A protein has these predicted regions:
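Conserved N-terminal catalytic core of the sugar/cofactor nucleotidyltransferase
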Residues: 1-7, 15-18, 33-112, 118
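Conserved G/P- and acidic residue-centered "switch" motifs that form tight phosphate/ATP-binding loops
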Residues: 11
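Short acidic, glycine/serine/threonine-rich loops at helix termini
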Residues: 17-21, 69, 120-123, 152-158
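Short glycine-rich, Thr/Ser-proximal phosphate-binding strand/loop in the N-terminal lobe
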Residues: 23-29
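Conserved beta-strand scaffold positions in the cores of enzyme catalytic domains, especially
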Residues: 28, 79, 140-142
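Conserved donor-nucleotide/metal-binding helix-loop-beta segment in metal-dependent transferases, i.e.
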Residues: 119-149
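Single conserved hydrophobic/aromatic residue that forms the stacking wall/gate
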Residues: 159-170
Length: 170
């Protein structure tokens, strides 16, 4: 089974104002000492896990050139421009349509472009475990933190945990 990645990079970065602006949102900014942007760090983090030709970037049409400049290794046809920004579900749907048109049987990992991940080794282990679970059947696997309260800006999934969770920070 093929593993693909969809990186969501269409946000305007409004919650990160004033550092982030509509013409240069958070995912295209360098917020760490190494000078790499958030989206570059995301691609770098998954590059040992997913072939670069199977990495898709879903973004706003206004950010297409920024994606091309910052991620020259991503095939141009893998830069998916959302016709209208409508948040996560339509973005994931757009990516799923493109992956399904290329592969009959694939796992699609969906990642935000602007998360700060401090432990890449734990991230990679978690990524591999999630892919393995997804490959075992028609499974939706989510990875995240345990929320303290519902937040409409991020969504909320209520789950029943049948297996113990791994309490390692990523």
């Amino acid at each position: 089974m093929k593993t693909t990645a969809l990186i969501m990079a269409g946000g305007k970065g409004e919650r990160f104002w004033p550092k982030s602006r509509v013409n240069m949102p958070k995912q295209f900014l360098s917020l760490t000492d190494d000078g790499k942007t958030m989206i570059q760090l995301t691609v770098e983090r998954i590059s040992p896990l997913v072939d670069i030709k199977d990495v898709y970037i879903a973004t706003n049409k206004n950010y297409r050139e920024l994606v091309k400049q910052q991620l020259p290794g991503i095939p141009e046809e893998n830069i998916l421009c959302e016709p209208v920004g409508r948040n996560t579900a339509p973005c994931v749907g757009l990516g799923a349509v493109h992956v399904a048109s290329k592969y009959d049987d694939a796992v699609m990992i969906v990642l935000p472009s602007d998360h700060l991940i401090k432990n890449n080794e734990v991230f990679a282990d978690t990524f591999k475990e999630a892919v393995q679970i997804a490959e075992e059947g028609a499974n939706l696997v989510t990875v995240g933190i345990t929320p303290n309260y519902p937040e409409t800006g991020y969504g909320l999934s209520l789950i029943h945990i049948s297996e113990p969770t791994r309490p390692e920070p990523i």
